[in-house]
Amino acid sequence: MHSRTIWSVRPISGCWANPDKARVTVRWVDVQKAEGVRSRLVARDFKGGDKDRDGLYATTPPLESKRLLISRAATRVKGKLGRKLLFIDVKKAHLNPKCQQDVYMELPAEAEGGPGMCGKLNFWLYGFRPAARAWGDHYSEKLEHAGFVRGNACAVLFIMRTGICR
């Protein structure tokens, strides 16, 4: 977290100057995994409101899109075996997109800064309501920049102009 500068330390006087801004707290969540315990700093964004429900969730592909990918990968093309189908798991996905809003949080106890300081987010943390959608938008932007075209029927299905589904 320190190498990525997920947040910038600021004086509290500037963080909550706007009375409409809720004070966002954070806490560590430990999960037992096969390789040991994984700790994750999670925001407790309870008072996000329901003003913009469309922006809360990342887009996910419908089952039909997954079936299309698998059938395209398994289909023989000009006598050759099907294509490779690879899946990836992006580690710390929510920490990749930059935070485009002014979002302030209380610092965890072990963070630099001490009392009288808060953190302004540079990148999203798990637990913030818009984080999943921001990751989906960030990922889509990277694919489009790499030459993929967004599908017409499914916005999360990307196709390379050469005809290869990705």
Question: Where do the PLM segments sit?
Answer:
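Chromodomain-type histone methyl-lysine reader module
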Residues: 1-141, 145-152
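Short, intrinsically disordered, charge-balanced linker/junction segments flanking boundaries
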Residues: 161-166
